[in-house]
Amino acid sequence: MSNGDAYNFPVIREYIGYADALYGFKSGFDKVVLSLGLKSGGYWPGNESKGLTNHQSTIFLFDADSGKVKAMVGGNYLTAMRTAASSSVSIKHLAREDAKILGMIGAGHQSAFQLRAAVKQRNFERILGWNRNSEKLSLLEAVAVDLGLPFEEVSLDELGAQADVIISITSSFAPILKATQVKAGTHIACMGTDTKGKQKIEAALVAKATVFTDEIAQAITIGECQHAIADGSMTAERITEIGAVISGKHSGRTSADEITLFNGTGVGLQDLSVASD
């Protein structure tokens, strides 16, 4: 995307007025590999009681020359994998090299994927966890034990004060993590804010951080940056697409005390890429 050879189409993401569900489409086209398609799906908060994951999606791939459908691929597992890969890439390029403590906010289906991907990027020594329903933290604790890492349930204040890297992987329409809770030098991977009104991070914290994203257009309209943009505490010009860091066009983190924030909105091209492989 950073080279201009691939682009995402505008996201559609709306409440359907039934089952408290969010439903929409993410799509795009890569001119280099001729990858064309879309992901259809959303978030059904009542699915857990039915033994289903709250996130449900299906990816459709089309032939770029004819428009014919080439494949229909289940998107639940692929979405969890690519979302974890995206935050993991942000940790690789933006977190301090000496990061030792990882803080996890959220303990749903995708949190286990996030944790397993994150530990591949830094030599973490401890995992801290916070979730609205503390009973669900047993999932993260089991993953941490499997990885040979100690796990501790903490308050948000404790998590922010200790964690060198924080991953936020939960659904919220009100800020959970505040600017006063995060120490200098922290890298925050804020994943899954992809709807107007969604918010996990206080706007003051977004404005305070050096912000990176997968796509600026999505970050300022449906992503975590929408609130700081709306209240005037930051402008879109302060946001850098992480592709520029990966390609070497941007230096990324510039100091040990800098707070970096990756606003991972999830782009259609990522879904098409993993579904095509």
Which stretches of residues belong to each language-model region?
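Adenosine-phosphate binding glycine-rich loop
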Residues: 199-277
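Rossmann-like adenosine-cofactor binding region
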Residues: 149-233
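Short helix-loop-beta connector
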Residues: 94-101, 123, 183-184
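N-terminal ligand-binding/catalytic initiation module
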Residues: 1-80, 88, 98, 269-272
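NAD(P)-binding Rossmann-fold cofactor-contacting core
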Residues: 120-147
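N-terminal Rossmann-fold NAD(P) dinucleotide-binding loop
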Residues: 111-112
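Conserved beta-strand elements of the Class I
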Residues: 102-103, 260
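Glycine-rich Rossmann-fold phosphate-binding loop(s) that bind the pyrophosphate
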Residues: 107-108
